[in-house]
């Protein structure tokens, strides 16, 4: 039995972020729809050919998306919320963009769908909305069209389809409550129709993604897989595909399904290969996810070979990426500025395709020379002085319980802070960033390229900070921010100023829609050589009598939004970052900054997928935050910000952070999230986001007032703040001014009516 390889998906955005640029040009009215579609076709053709040239045997088709693949599935099924529908009932690409962004070049603007994280990654999807009695029909043929494209190019392909049970699991009920699982029988005919169309095209294998199978599912959801796959069997071979964790807990259910193969993540899961082999039907294909699709590190192929070699000849075997390569940058070869030694430690998506080819060849031939040579730099890294810092390791070992405790309880601190700041009821603020204009980005780029000296750069940034302060004063905000003109990204900026991180030139990965991020890479022990944010915070504070927040990104978020080391635990990395940022808090405080925000939007997304593993993670995640913050004096107010969160199942840990103020993203969920804080009787102050910054739509004063009144039904007014959902970096100034003016007016109206 010859072993072949495949990938579960490939990055969509293009090496130079061509997709992002085409999308934004189309949205701005500077490109036609056909020009946008042409960019998509060109990228798909390029990426299939690149994977093929790198040695991939079976290419994924259907992994491309114009916004996100869950939203693509919603359109496939005809699941379009009423507010986003075209008047004639048709579905087009603007329908998709209205769901994702709230507006598109055609059609009426409407509130965008809710967005949340894809499992425990930094990728996002638009949450499907379900209503009672909903009907589904095949309405969007993107998958079939792309299969036709790939077949016309002569490729050997494997269509990729998000499975029906996971799709329903990822959605939310709107309107009258009901069990969304009851919709399963309604969507299965559409899946049957799609599989029949694929069979007509001569497709042999379909990758049907059911990552919900790695979760500890409620019994009814686990039981739903059997009737679902009974209905889908027979037309093509189905590769049931899981990732991000192991499947051993649900293996009995999986092994009974009428599918022909199973893909397992052998990087992030703890599944034993021998147990998988023994418990799966003998005629099933096993796809072994051996190459990590979520990082940038070169794989130790000798280790991967040893992990799987005993199955060679015993069953049909494929080798694969652990998950879609969507989560990895595209091509290491264009990184011309990386130090040669460090570069030898990495592999991006195309290099991971090459690793799959090397591993396939070694398993088929038994010759391990090539994989041994490939793995040599990994051995060298384990002993590199770039990786280990004795001082950091010594400080980490000396941490005591007292280091993560504030000097006084919240009640005492709150009184000291009220005396210091004397803020009104319904105090208004923003989350941190202001619009990153073309001028600001150009300034940073010129400085980075050496076209601008440090003095002129600092003068330019200072002017933008001054403008941000003036704008906020004019709007009447109560607590100001400096606007973060000097920051390209909330994680990248800190990584650039901390030892132990390195950066790529083109290591972009998709976050959602057209938004891409370039995560730093943690290559060694983390420390802070000098103050990072103090000078700009101090300058901003000198421009106003109102308090200006110091702005830090928290240790767990920096960890979650970076590519972490694989040779130490995530806990170790988080606590190293926390110690570095603890020093920053002390320096900000010494510089006269009285309010310091430590953003932890990623705290919840870092949760292990299996609930049984949550407690250990939350314990060290909370400890890292407290270690970062606890150095602050009583009258220094510590804020934190979180987004895309469902808090009800981690409220103990949210409270344990002991932040004086937490700001959260609530507008898309219509303040639903506050129910968790009310039920828990959350003791500290809360700023529920009152408008969605991911949409360019400007909320009315009445809309914001209504949301704040809802909030006041759940949280005492004296503990409520007024703020947007998130930072305003991606918005333009006109809509930002208009939205904030309405927000401030809403707060004033409520003060007057109290």
Curated annotation (Swiss-Prot):
KW Ribonucleoprotein (keyword) present: no
UniProt-listed Enzyme Commission number(s): 2.1.1.14
Positions of transmembrane segments: none
Pathway: Amino-acid biosynthesis; L-methionine biosynthesis via de novo pathway; L-methionine from L-homocysteine (MetE route): step 1/1
Residues noted as binding Zn(2+) in the record, renumbered to the chain: 641, 643, 665, 726
Record field: catalytic activity: 5-methyltetrahydropteroyltri-L-glutamate + L-homocysteine = tetrahydropteroyltri-L-glutamate + L-methionine
Disulfide bonds: none
GO BP terms in the entry: methionine biosynthetic process; methylation
Binding site for 5-methyltetrahydropteroyltri-L-glutamate: 17-20, 117, 515-516, 561, 605
Claim: Zinc-finger is one of the keywords in the record: no
Gene Ontology molecular functions: 5-methyltetrahydropteroyltriglutamate-homocysteine S-methyltransferase activity; zinc ion binding
Reported cofactor(s): Zn(2+)
UniProt: L-methionine binding residues: 431-433, 484, 599
Family matches, as Pfam families: Meth_synt_1, Meth_synt_2
Enzyme class: transferase
Cofactor note: Binds 1 zinc ion per subunit.
Active site: 694
Key words, A-Z: Amino-acid biosynthesis, Metal-binding, Methionine biosynthesis, Methyltransferase, Repeat, Transferase, Zinc
InterPro entries to which the protein is assigned, alphabetical: Cbl-indep_Met_Synth_N (IPR013215), Cobalamin-indep_Met_synthase (IPR006276), Met_Synth_C/arc (IPR002629), UROD/MetE-like_sf (IPR038071)
Residues the entry annotates as binding L-homocysteine: 431-433, 484, 599
Functional note: Catalyzes the transfer of a methyl group from 5-methyltetrahydrofolate to homocysteine resulting in methionine formation.
Family indicated by similarity: Belongs to the vitamin-B12 independent methionine synthase family.
Record protein name field: 5-methyltetrahydropteroyltriglutamate--homocysteine methyltransferase
């Amino acid at each position: 039995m010859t072993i072949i390889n495949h990938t579960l998906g490939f990055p969509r955005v293009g090496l130079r972020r061509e997709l992002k640029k085409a999308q934004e040009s189309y949205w701005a009215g500077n490109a036609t729809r056909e020009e946008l579609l042409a960019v998509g076709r060109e990228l798909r053709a390029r990426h299939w050919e690149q994977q093929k040239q790198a040695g991939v045997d079976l290419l994924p088709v259907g992994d491309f998306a114009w916004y996100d693949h869950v939203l693509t599935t919603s359109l496939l099924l005809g699941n379009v919320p009423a507010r986003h529908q075209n008047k004639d009932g048709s579905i087009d690409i603007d329908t998709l963009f209205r769901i994702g962004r709230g507006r598109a070049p055609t059609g009426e603007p409407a509130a965008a769908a809710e967005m949340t994280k894809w499992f425990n990654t930094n990728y996002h999807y638009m949450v499907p909305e379900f209503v009672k009695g909903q009907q589904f029909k095949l309405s969007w043929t993107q998958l079939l069209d792309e299969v036709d494209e790939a077949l016309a190019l002569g490729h050997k392909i494997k269509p990729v389809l998000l499975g029906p049970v996971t799709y329903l699991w990822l959605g939310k009920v709107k309107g009258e409550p009901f069990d969304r699982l009851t919709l399963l029988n309604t969507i299965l005919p559409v899946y049957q129709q799609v599989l029949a169309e694929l069979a007509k095209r001569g497709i042999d294998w379909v990758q049907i993604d059911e990552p919900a199978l790695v979760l500890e599912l409620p019994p009814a959801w686990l039981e739903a897989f059997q009737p679902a796959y009974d209905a889908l069997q027979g037309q093509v071979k189905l590769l049931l595909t899981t990732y991000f964790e192991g499947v051993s807990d649900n293996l009995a259910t999986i092994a009974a399904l009428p599918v022909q193969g199973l893909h397992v993540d052998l990087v992030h899961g703890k599944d034993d290969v021998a147990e998988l082999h023994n418990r799966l039907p003998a005629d099933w294909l096993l796809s072994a996810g051996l190459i990590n699709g979520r990082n940038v590190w070169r794989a130790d192929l000798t280790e991967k070979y040893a992990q799987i070699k005993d199955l060679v000849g015993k069953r049909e075997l494929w080798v694969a990426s652990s998950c879609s390569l969507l989560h990895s940058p595209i091509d290491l070869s264009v990184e011309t500025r990386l130090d040669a030694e460090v570069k030898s430690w990495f592999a991006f998506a195309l290099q991971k395709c090459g690793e799959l080819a090397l591993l396939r060849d070694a398993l088929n031939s038994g010759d391990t020379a090539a994989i041994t040579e490939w793995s040599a730099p990994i051995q060298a890294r384990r002993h590199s002085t770039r990786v280990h810092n004795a001082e950091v390791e010594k400080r980490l070992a000396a941490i005591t319980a007292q280091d993560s405790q504030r000097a006084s309880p919240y009640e005492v601190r709150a009184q000291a802070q009220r005396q210091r700041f004397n803020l009104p009821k319904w105090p208004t603020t923003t989350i941190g960033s202001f619009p990153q204009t073309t001028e600001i980005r150009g300034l940073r780029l010129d400085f980075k390229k050496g076209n601008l000296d440090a003095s002129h750069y600092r003068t330019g940034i200072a002017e933008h900070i001054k403008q941000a302060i003036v704008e906020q004063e004019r709007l009447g905000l109560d607590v100001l921010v400096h606007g973060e003109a000097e920051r390209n990204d909330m994680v990248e900026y800190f990584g650039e100023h901390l030892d132990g991180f390195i950066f790529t030139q083109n290591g972009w990965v998709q976050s959602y829609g057209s938004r891409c991020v370039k995560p730093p890479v943690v290559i060694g022990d983390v420390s802070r050589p000098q103050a990072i944010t103090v000078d700009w915070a101090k300058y901003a504070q000198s421009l106003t009598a109102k308090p200006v927040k110091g702005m830090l990104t928290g240790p767990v978020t920096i960890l979650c939004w970076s590519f972490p080391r694989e040779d130490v635990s995530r806990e170790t990395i988080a606590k190293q970052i926390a110690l570095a940022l603890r020093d920053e808090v002390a320096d900000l405080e010494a510089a006269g900054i009285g309010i310091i925000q430590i953003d932890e939007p990623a705290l919840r997304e870092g949760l292990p997928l299996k609930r049984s593993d949550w407690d250990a993670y939350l314990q060290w995640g909370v400890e890292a935050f407290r270690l970062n913050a606890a150095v602050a004096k009583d009258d220094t107010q510590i804020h934190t910000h979180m987004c895309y969160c469902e808090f009800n199942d981690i409220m103990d840990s949210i409270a344990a952070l002991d932040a004086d103020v937490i700001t959260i993203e609530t507008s898309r969920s219509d303040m639903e999230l506050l129910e968790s804080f009310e039920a828990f009787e959350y003791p500290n102050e809360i700023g529920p986001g009152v408008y969605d910054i991911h949409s360019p739509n400007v909320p009315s004063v009445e809309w914001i007032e209504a949301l704040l009144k809802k909030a006041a039904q759940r949280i005492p007014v004296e503990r409520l703040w007024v703020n947007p959902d998130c930072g305003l970096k991606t918005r333009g100034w006109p809509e930002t001014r208009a939205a904030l003016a309405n927000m401030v007016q809403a707060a004033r109206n409520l003060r007057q009516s109290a």
